[in-house]
């Protein structure tokens, strides 16, 4: 339902004649931020686009004041969140190229979600990745980050892009002119999303999880930048808790400590089973003695 004005506490979709907000698309989530005009203030909770991609729809929650159709507003994108999303999107491109280099050119993108806290990448492959393959892929992406490769964007005719070997995004439809995002010659893809200026801006890359989502389709969840540090800190805290429980000073001895604890549990279970057997024999003896 179209309305001419909105006020405090109301939720609405606001359309602007121009916007700095990125509208959800290509697997990348939409931007958030704020919109203001005088006493009017609203949180932009999400940004999407109409089916043709020509109109940007800002899902807003009015925090104060009111506003009418035709009013001028100032906008501000949540830049920290956008930066996290941007790092993850470029990392998704590097990940696809790394997977193709490690596993083979049969790997094709089968979907993705790029958000601020992590990204997931679906791809065609016939079996689970081994621990060695996961480390190899992860190391290759981090190697490209350390190489500080400039990331460039260029619009060109689609046929020219195909000649360059640019990879297309799964499920996307393209016009005669496409936007190509390149990280040197390591990664060349059609893409309309946001990206860093240099692979070094990613900081770090870490695979969090790998699994199956369908027959012949695998999924990797991964992190970049501060997300990697938070993940490592969380894992370190768990390891230190385990060390404390096992009374181990050196974290490198955790595996040995767990193995010893497992062996102790097995021995105690064997002793319990022996005691139960002896108890059962004694009870049977008492039963017969009473007859």
Segments from the language model and where they lie:
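Conserved nucleotide-binding/hydrolysis modules and their immediate coupling elements
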Residues: 1-75, 80
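A generic structural motif
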Residues: 20, 64, 79-83, 93, ...
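Short helix/loop capping segments that flank catalytic or ligand/cofactor-binding pockets
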Residues: 22-25, 32, 85, 131-132, ...
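Active/ligand-binding-proximal structured segments within catalytic/core domains
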Residues: 22-35, 68-123
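Generic, well-ordered alpha-helical scaffold segments in large soluble proteins
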Residues: 34-35, 76, 94-102, 136-147, ...
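Short, hydrophobic beta-strand segments
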Residues: 57-61, 75-81, 118-128, 222, ...
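Non-catalytic interaction/regulatory segments
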Residues: 106, 116-213
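Terminal appendage regions of diverse proteins
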Residues: 106, 199-291
């Amino acid at each position: 339902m179209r309305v001419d004005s909105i006020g405090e506490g109301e939720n609405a979709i606001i359309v602007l004649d121009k916007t700095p907000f990125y509208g959800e698309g290509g697997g990348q989530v939409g931007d958030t931020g704020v919109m203001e005009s005088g006493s009017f203030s609203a949180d932009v909770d999400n940004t999407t686009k109409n089916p043709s991609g020509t109109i940007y729809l800002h899902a807003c929650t009015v925090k104060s004041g009111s506003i009418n159709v035709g009013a001028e507003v100032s906008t501000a994108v949540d830049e920290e969140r956008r930066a996290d999303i941007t790092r993850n999107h470029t990392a998704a491109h590097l990940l696809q190229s790394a997977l193709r280099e490690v596993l083979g050119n049969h790997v094709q993108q089968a979907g993705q979600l790029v958000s601020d806290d992590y990204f997931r990448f679906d791809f065609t492959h016939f079996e689970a990745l081994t621990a060695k393959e996961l480390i190899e892929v992860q190391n290759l992406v981090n190697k490209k980050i350390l190489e500080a490769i400039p990331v460039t964007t260029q619009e060109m005719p689609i046929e020219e892009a195909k000649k360059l070997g640019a990879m297309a995004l799964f499920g996307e439809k393209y016009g005669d002119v496409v936007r190509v995002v390149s990280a040197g010659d390591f990664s060349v893809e059609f893409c309309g999303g946001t990206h860093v200026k240099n692979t070094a801006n990613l900081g770090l890359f870490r695979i969090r999880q790998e699994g199956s989502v369908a027959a012949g389709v695998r999924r990797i969840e991964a992190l970049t930048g501060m997300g990697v540090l938070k993940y490592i800190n969380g894992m370190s805290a768990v390891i230190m808790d385990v060390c404390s429980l096992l009374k181990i000073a050196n974290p490198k001895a955790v595996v040995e400590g767990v193995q010893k604890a497992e062996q102790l549990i097995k021995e105690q279970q064997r002793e319990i089973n022996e005691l139960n057997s002896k108890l059962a024999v004694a009870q049977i003896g008492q039963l017969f003695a009473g007859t």
